[in-house]
UniProtKB/Swiss-Prot annotation:
SUPFAM superfamilies: Polo-box domain (SSF82615), Protein kinase-like (PK-like) (SSF56112). This is Inactive serine/threonine-protein kinase PLK5. Belongs to the protein kinase superfamily. Ser/Thr protein kinase family. CDC5/Polo subfamily. Keywords: Cell cycle, Cell division, Cytoplasm, Differentiation, Mitosis, Nucleus. Its main location: nucleus. The truncated protein kinase domain is predicted to be catalytically inactive; has lost the main activatory autophosphorylation site and the conserved key residues involved in phospho-substrate. The C-terminal region (containing the POLO box domain) is sufficient for inducing cell cycle arrest. Residues 255-336 form the POLO box domain. PROSITE patterns: POLO_BOX, PROTEIN_KINASE_DOM. One of its GO terms (cellular component) is centrosome. Expressed in the brain, neurons and glial cells. Also expressed in highly differentiated cells, such as the serous acini in the parotid gland, distal and proximal tubules of the kidney, tubules of the seminal gland, Kupffer cells and some hepatocytes in the liver, and some cells in the germinal center of lymph nodes (at protein level).
Length: 336
């Protein structure tokens, strides 16, 4: 509740010992900008003594839930995407910032670097360091060249994905290659990408790659998360030492393959969605849908995600940087 209302967890401190002490003693920043009802509810929920915390029945009767305006219904995508208001700026921008504050997972894409492919004890970073980092950037002269040979520094598949005719690609890989090629078969290069729309999509904004030892884990935008062990899909531990993965919102949506090159991380999902995150200049693209419904969504540093159908780049072309990113993703899949 604290995180939803403020946009940050209540207990954040370094080192960890200080954070654990704050949890035990119930010390956290007081959100003075919230309403009095919201602050009282947070105080009750985060009481140091568990016996003083409200039960579910008492919680539902709290003034925070019983007073004020409550909409009759909400669209399904409101669970994983900030609202898009049809209001002219600057008021529209203010409302959108409020929505992004409530949905903290909807942030600019996180650059992937080869260091993140290392496991613990091998120079790899702490998993917490792989969260969104809107401050990371490189100048134009530091943009890495994506046209060199593809060298995969890490890759993995589901165990069931290993079966198939010798020397042949899996159908989902072939489909992803066709979709990427369709995006590249567009009109002449443009000076900038065409104007698109902001549409909610389900993708994986967070991941951690310890595949050398423990596996690859990711979290979807709706909060669903799971992982892949080095020798197959993740399964719940009976001893209770690991929590059961939260099922994603998409029906049967799971990660089939992940590929990491020196400049990008590619994720291929069971619904055919291709997600590519680039290092250097933070950029992210998601290719989803099938056939004429194919949709390309792009994120660049400091700008919200923009989506457009395949017909738009066919008629208006796309920026050279976008074409370079699509071509790099195509070559990554061709290298397996």
């Amino acid at each position: 509740m604290y995180t939803v209302l403020t946009g940050t967890p209540p207990f954040m401190a370094s080192p960890l010992s200080e954070m654990y002490q704050n949890i035990r003693e119930g010390h956290y920043p007081e959100p003075a900008h919230l309403s009095a009802n919201a602050r009282r509810l947070i105080v009750h929920l985060l009481a140091p003594n568990p016996a003083e915390r409200p039960s579910l029945d008492h919680l539902l009767q709290d003034d925070f839930f019983t007073q004020g305006f409550t909409p009759d219904r909400l669209p399904a995508h409101s669970c994983h995407s900030p609202p898009i208001f049809a209001i002219p700026p600057p008021l529209g921008r203010i409302f959108r910032k409020v929505g992004q504050r409530l949905l903290t997972q909807c942030r600019p894409p996180c650059p992937f670097t080869p260091k993140e492919a290392s496991g613990p004890g091998e120079g790899g970073p702490d998993p917490d360091s792989m969260e969104w980092d809107g401050e990371s950037s490189l100048s134009a002269k530091e943009v890495p060249c994506l046209e060199g040979p593809i060298h995969l520094v890490a890759q993995g598949t589901l165990q069931s994905d290993l079966a198939g005719p010798e020397g042949s690609r899996r159908p989902e890989v072939e489909a992803a290659l066709r979709h990427l090629q369709l995006c590249l078969d567009v009109g002449p290069p443009a000076t900038q990408d065409p104007l698109g729309e902001q549409q909610p999509i389900l993708w994986a904004p967070k991941w951690v790659d310890y595949s050398s030892k423990y596996g690859f884990g990711y979290q979807l935008l709706d909060g669903g998360r799971t992982g892949r062990h080095p020798h197959g899909p993740a399964t719940p531990r009976r001893e209770g030492t690991l929590p059961t993965p939260v099922p994603p919102a998409g029906p049967g949506l799971c990660l089939l393959r992940f590929l990491a090159s020196e400049h990008a991380l590619l994720l291929l999902f069971s619904n055919g969605m291709v997600q590519v995150s680039f290092s250097g200049v933070p950029a992210q693209l998601v290719l989803s849908g099938e056939g004429e419904g194919l949709q390309l969504t792009l994120w660049e540093q400091g700008s919200p995600g923009t989506s457009y159908s395949l017909d738009v780049p066919r008629s208006h072309g796309c920026a050279p940087t976008t074409g370079q990113h699509l071509h790099h993703a195509l070559r990554m899949l061709q290298s397996i």
